[in-house]
Curated annotation (Swiss-Prot):
Pfam families referenced in this protein's UniProt entry, alphabetically: OSCP (PF00213)
UniProt membrane topology term: Peripheral membrane protein
Subcellular location: Cell membrane
UniProt similarity note: Belongs to the ATPase delta chain family.
Keyword Ion transport carried by entry: yes
Keyword annotations of the record: ATP synthesis, Cell membrane, CF(1), Hydrogen ion transport, Ion transport, Membrane, Transport
Protein's recorded name: ATP synthase subunit delta
Assembly and oligomerization: F-type ATPases have 2 components, F(1) - the catalytic core - and F(0) - the membrane proton channel. F(1) has five subunits: alpha(3), beta(3), gamma(1), delta(1), epsilon(1). F(0) has three main subunits: a(1), b(2) and c(10-14). The alpha and beta chains form an alternating ring which encloses part of the gamma chain. F(1) is attached to F(0) by a central stalk formed by the gamma and epsilon chains, while a peripheral stalk is formed by the delta and b chains.
Keyword Transport on entry: yes
One GO CC term, this protein: plasma membrane
Species whose genome carries this gene: Nocardioides sp. (strain ATCC BAA-499 / JS614)
Record NCBIfam families: ATP_synt_delta, PRK13430.1
Gene expressing this chain: atpH
GO MF entries: proton-transporting ATP synthase activity, rotational mechanism
C-alpha cells in the first residue's frame, strides 16, 4: 500500500490508494521504475503549469472516457506508456480539488523513484537523502542559492549535481532534483518527506534522533531494536548531534515525539518553579 499524503482527503485519498497499485514493487524492472518516475514528475509539472488542463481533466461533469482520451491524445509518444496509462486512469477518478491530482502524481513519482533503487539500496537511499538535507541546512550559502526565486530550477539542479558528483544513487539524484520543482514549501521539507516515503515504501520507519554526543554502535543498535519492537517494523535511525542539548536524546518518529534531553528536563523544572 502506498503511503498516504497528509494533504489529501476524502475521494482524493481514495484515488491515490487505487493508483498506488500501478507502482507496486514487482510490477516493473528498476530501470522501468526510474523511467516511470521521470515521466510522472514531468506530468505533475505539466498539470501545475497548465491550470486549464488541470481543470479539464478533473471536471466531474466530463465523462471519464473523454478525459482519458484527452490524456492519451496529449501524451502518447511524449511519455512512456505506463505513465500515460496511469494518468488516463487517474483522470477518471474523483478529486476533491484539482490540485490534488498533480500532488498525487508527484507522490507516485517519488514512490517509483524509490522503487528504482531496489530493496538492497533502500538504507543507502534513505541515508543519502538525510545527508543531502543536512548539508543544505547547514550551508547558508547553498541554502540561500536553492531558495533564490531569481535562479532557474536548472541552475539549482546544477548546483546539486556538483554536490552529489557521481557519489549518490541515481534515485537520490532524481529525488533531490524533484525537491526543487515540487509542491513543498522548502527543499528541506521536500527531502524530509521523500525520506519518509522511501522508508514507508520499503516497509520501514524513520526516526530522527537528536543527541548531545555521537552514539556508540552498541547504543545505536539498542535504540534501533527498541524502536523496531515498539512500532512493530524495522526503524531506520537518522542521528543529529547537537551539543546544546547537554545530554539525553529526542526521538521523532511519525507524529510521536519522545523528548528526554537534559535541556527539556531543565525547561520543565523551570516551568514548575515558575508556576
Amino acid at each position: 500500500m502506498v503511503q498516504q499524503l497528509s494533504s489529501l482527503r476524502g475521494s482524493s485519498a481514495e484515488a491515490l490508494q487505487v493508483l498506488g497499485e500501478q507502482v507496486d514493487g514487482d510490477r516493473y524492472t528498476l530501470e522501468e521504475f526510474a523511467a516511470l518516475a521521470d515521466d510522472l514528475f514531468r506530468a505533475a509539472a505539466l498539470l501545475r503549469s497548465e491550470p486549464a488542463l488541470r481543470r479539464a481533466v478533473t471536471d466531474v461533469s466530463t465523462p471519464a472516457e473523454a478525459k482519458s482520451s484527452l490524456v492519451h491524445g496529449l501524451l502518447d509518444g511524449k511519455l512512456g506508456a505506463p505513465a500515460v496509462d496511469l494518468l488516463a486512469q487517474a483522470v477518471g477518478l474523483r478529486w476533491v480539488a484539482a490540485r490534488d491530482l498533480a500532488d498525487a502524481v508527484e507522490h507516485l513519482g517519488v514512490v517509483a523513484a524509490v522503487r528504482s533503487a531496489g530493496r538492497r539500496e533502500s538504507v543507502r537511499l534513505s541515508d543519502e537523502l538525510f545527508v543531502v538535507a543536512q548539508v543544505v541546512e547547514e550551508n547558508a550559502e547553498l541554502r540561500i542559492a536553492l531558495s533564490d526565486p531569481v535562479r532557474s530550477t536548472d541552475d539549482k539542479r546544477e548546483l546539486l549535481r556538483g554536490l552529489l558528483a557521481q557519489r549518490a544513487l541515481p534515485a537520490t539524484v532524481a529525488l533531490v532534483e524533484q525537491a526543487l520543482a515540487g509542491s513543498f514549501r522548502s527543499f528541506h521539507a521536500a527531502v524530509s518527506e521523500y525520506q519518509k516515503v522511501a522508508a514507508a515504501t520499503q516497509g520501514e520507519g524513520v526516526a530522527l534522533v537528536r543527541v548531545a554526543r555521537e552514539l556508540t554502535e552498541a547504543e545505536r543498535t539498542r535504540l534501533e531494536q527498541a524502536l523496531s519492537t515498539q512500532y512493530g517494523r524495522p526503524v531506520h535511525l537518522n542521528i543529529e548531534v547537537d551539543p546544546s542539548l547537554l545530554g539525553g536524546m529526542r526521538v521523532e518518529i511519525g507524529d510521536d515525539v519522545i523528548d528526554g534531553t537534559v535541556v527539556s528536563r531543565l525547561d520543565d523544572a523551570r516551568r514548575r518553579l515558575a508556576g
